[in-house]
Amino acid sequence: MTVTAPPATPAIMRVENVVKVFGGLTAVGGVSLDIPERSIVSVIGPNGAGKTTLFNMLTGLYKPTSGRILLGDRDVTRSRPDVVTGLGVARTFQNIRLFGAMTATENVMIGRHARMRAGLIGSIVRPPWVRREERETEARARELLDYVGLSAASANRYAGELPYGDQRRVEIARALASDPKLLLLDEPTAGMNPQESDALTDFMQRLPEERGLAILLIEHDMKVVMGVSERITVLDHGEKIAEGEPAVVRADPKVIEAYLGKQD
């Protein structure tokens, strides 16, 4: 009897041989990877390996020197960041980028802007349907803050007054506000204590099923990476040196050398 293998999960994003050159420096050199739907894929590597440059290309902040980036069947290689966001890609940054003088709720409402119908004129005139949309957006923001574990009291506080771990939660809620198909997280546990990191790890593992999205993760904490990732891509000096399931990557001699140095 012939056993048919289950069909492969479709890729929400496909990266094909992307290169980014700044002057004479190759920051990313011919990297390819697939991000399946409802999966968690991690990109790891030493500082300066090209991870954030890769993220910036995937979100439209940088244009690749060569190669292709496909979101589903659509080529977004040269698309503007707002177009990429509108197609369902959201991200957080290594350095938190919240508006400190706005409340946590207001910060998350900004993340919903791409899904709102009111334009400039509507926001000025504010007819009844615009006011209704604003109320719905605020309710949605509060729901997301509760979902990421922020208390109702903290939702009303200025973002700049919140503890670091709570600011991270607000940033993730803001990214989720755009209803992404793909969420890019850049060092989400940076600066967190072990308890906060463990809580965020558990939260990330729930996201693909609960929100129907895929996650592409940059993270230096190997406990987090090995605990949540289905596949890992390893970069060193802009080149992909390894790829595969966590156990395979962890035992790869090239990965060990990149992180620990060549052993005599």
What are these regions (language model features)?
Residues T2-D264:
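Glycine-rich phosphate-binding loops of nucleotide-dependent enzymes
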